[in-house]
């Protein structure tokens, strides 16, 4: 599934840091590896069911950054996660999936030892 990923500047900075840390050249590869690593935890509540993931302002401040190709299974898992947790409503499926990915990057920033990409 190809879609446009929307990120905030803080998430773009996290991606840049991860690219440097793991010697990865592509934004897309960082996103894919981060998502897969989050799934391997098999504990969605750890990442998504926290107060820090509920919007307090600027929820819709993310801008489309780049196109990404993700396998359908992972894309559908991200869609389901969005439905399972009490996130704000978004206008499109792409924005909903982007929200779940931003949550993963928030988690990586706060718990860098928990996920290994």
What are the residue ranges of the model-derived segments?
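Surface-exposed, Lys/Arg-rich phosphate-binding patches that contact polyanionic backbones
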Residues: 8-29, 33, 71-95
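Short, basic amphipathic alpha-helical segments that act as recognition/interaction helices
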Residues: 25-50, 89-117
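Short, positively charged interaction helices/loops
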Residues: 40-83, 110-117
């Amino acid at each position: 599934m190809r879609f446009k990923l929307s990120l905030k500047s803080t998430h773009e900075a996290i991606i840049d840091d991860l690219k440097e840390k793991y010697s990865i050249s592509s934004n897309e590869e960082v996103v894919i590896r981060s998502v897969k690593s989050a799934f391997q935890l098999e504990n969605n509540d750890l990442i998504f069911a926290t107060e820090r993931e509920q919007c307090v302002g600027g929820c819709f401040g993310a801008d489309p950054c780049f196109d990404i190709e993700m396998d359908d299974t992972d894309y559908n898992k991200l869609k389901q996660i969005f439905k399972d947790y009490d996130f704000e409503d978004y206008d499109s499926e792409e924005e909903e999936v982007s929200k779940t990915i931003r949550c993963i990057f928030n988690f990586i920033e706060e718990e860098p030892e928990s996920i290994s990409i």
